């Protein structure tokens, strides 16, 4: 069975780990070489690196004729906190706009019911009501799209990821134990790995440092 390609998120995590583990500065060619060792396709390293730069997770500076890249764990944490803070502010703003529109719609409906006759003013109120309902629907859609960035939702997903990772690591440990047992019994572990599609570098999963 051929190995599955890495997702963009996993490529970003592995590339970010290169900087955090070394706490050093690198040129692009050095990052490409180190990325290849992390099973990231060479041709994609530059794009993955640029996505980290765009998200302000990796810093870059041109010195002379060369661009240097670096990222420290503390910088990455501050960057994520800044993004979460910005998204939370947007979320709060949309909630306030949604609340205001709800109040306006309730007022317009009440006003329309009390007038009792359909005159020009009432027609204007009806059109305004429809416009505000459409605006409210749009805001609620935007609010729903931002909800996954809510710090509470983010923390819940992070906790679930940890649970799944612990379960996966338990299976990894059991696989290593089984391979060791087979080796002690005289079996060819290389054949076992090949038959069961177990990679040589099978190791425990780890969450990136935030």
Curated annotation (Swiss-Prot):
Q: What is the protein name given in its UniProt record? A: Meiotic coiled-coil protein 7
Task: Give the protein's function.
Answer: Required for meiotic recombination.
Q: What is the lineage of its organism?
A: Eukaryota, Fungi, Dikarya, Ascomycota, Taphrinomycotina
The gene behind this protein is mcp7
Q: Which InterPro entries match?
A: LZ3wCH (IPR040661), Mnd1 (IPR005647), Mnd1_HTH (IPR040453)
Gene Ontology terms describing biological process: meiotic joint molecule formation; meiotic strand invasion involved in reciprocal meiotic recombination; reciprocal meiotic recombination
Could you list the residue ranges forming a coiled coil in this record? 77-148
An example Gene Ontology CC term for this record: nucleus
Similarity comment = Belongs to the MND1 family.
How this chain assembles, per its entry, is: Interacts with meu13.
Localisation: Cytoplasm; Nucleus
Report a single Gene Ontology molecular function. Answer: recombinase activator activity
**Keyword Electron transport included in the entry's annotation:** no
Question: A Pfam family name for this chain?
Answer: Mnd1
Keyword tags: Coiled coil, Cytoplasm, Meiosis, Nucleus
């Amino acid at each position: 069975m051929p190995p599955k390609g890495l997702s963009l998120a996993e490529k970003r995590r592995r590339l970010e780990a290169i900087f955090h583990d070394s706490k050093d500065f690198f040129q692009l060619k050095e990052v490409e070489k180190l990325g290849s060792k992390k099973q990231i396709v060479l041709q994609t390293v530059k794009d993955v690196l640029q996505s980290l730069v765009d998200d302000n997770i990796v810093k870059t500076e041109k010195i002379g004729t060369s661009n240097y890249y670096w990222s420290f764990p503390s910088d990455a944490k501050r960057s994520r906190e800044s993004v979460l803070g910005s998204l939370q502010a947007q979320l709060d703003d949309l909630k306030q706009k949604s609340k205001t529109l709800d109040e306006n719609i309730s007022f317009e409906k009440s006003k329309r019911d009390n007038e009792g006759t359909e005159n020009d003013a009432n027609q204007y109120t009806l059109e305004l009501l429809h416009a505000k309902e459409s605006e409210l629907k749009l805001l609620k859609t935007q609010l729903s799209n931002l909800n996954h960035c809510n710090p509470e939702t983010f923390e819940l997903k992070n906790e679930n990821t940890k649970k799944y990772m612990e379960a996966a690591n338990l299976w990894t440990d059991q696989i290593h134990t089984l391979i060791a047992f087979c080796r002690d019994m005289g079996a060819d572990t290389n054949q076992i790995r090949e038959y069961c599609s177990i990679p040589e570098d099978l190791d425990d999963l780890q969450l990136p440092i935030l």
